[in-house]
Amino acid sequence: MTEQKRPVLTLKRKTEGETLVRSRKTIINVTTPPKWKVKKQKLAEKAAREAELAAKKAQARQALSIYLNLPTLDDAVNTLKPWWPGLFDGDTPRLLACGIRDVLLEDVAQRNIPLSHKKLRRALKAITRSESYLCAMKAGACRYDTEGYVTEHISQEEEAYAAERLDKIRRQNRIKAELQAVLDEK
């Protein structure tokens, strides 16, 4: 046995033919961040979007608050028509005589009509600021009193004023619609 060398097992064995090659550090690029980080970013983005939307809505609400909240034309007509049918041609309001509000207020006091000054004033504003009323204001058109009689005719200046008011009201309605759309979005 001495002739044959028996290999001895050791823990530190050198391998023949291999030399140690020092390798560099390998850099691993992670393309996706961890799930907790993604979730945190999504929550932060959602909170930022909600805060921005809330700020937009608050700004739109404040901008919308400057406009007068008048009743609709149908509500205004239904408020005044039972007491003064001469002011209307069917369900469409006729052009009102100048100073009609004072006449209507006196009539309310004399006949004890259950209509407050505020409701009367708002109904008249809703009627006189409606697009159909302003479109009807053409030179030569007649103005009517509470009984339905012609009192005067529309002048050129009144027609020009009505056209200006109509443009302003249409512009305001367009702005109001945009602001309302901002408030209605989720």
From Swiss-Prot:
One of the components on the FinOP fertility inhibition complex, which inhibits the expression of traJ gene, which in turn regulates the expression of some 20 transfer genes. The transfer genes are responsible for the process, called conjugal transfer, in which DNA is transmitted from one bacterial host to another. RNA-binding that interacts with the traJ mRNA and its antisense RNA, finP, stabilizing finP against endonucleolytic degradation and facilitating sense-antisense RNA recognition. GO terms for molecular function: RNA binding. Belongs to the FinO family. InterPro entries: Fertility_inhibition_FinO_N, ProQ/FinO, ProQ/FinO_sf. The keyword Zinc does not apply. This is Fertility inhibition protein. It comes from the Bacteria. Pfam families: FinO_N, ProQ. Keywords: Conjugation, Plasmid, Repressor, RNA-binding, Transcription, Transcription regulation.
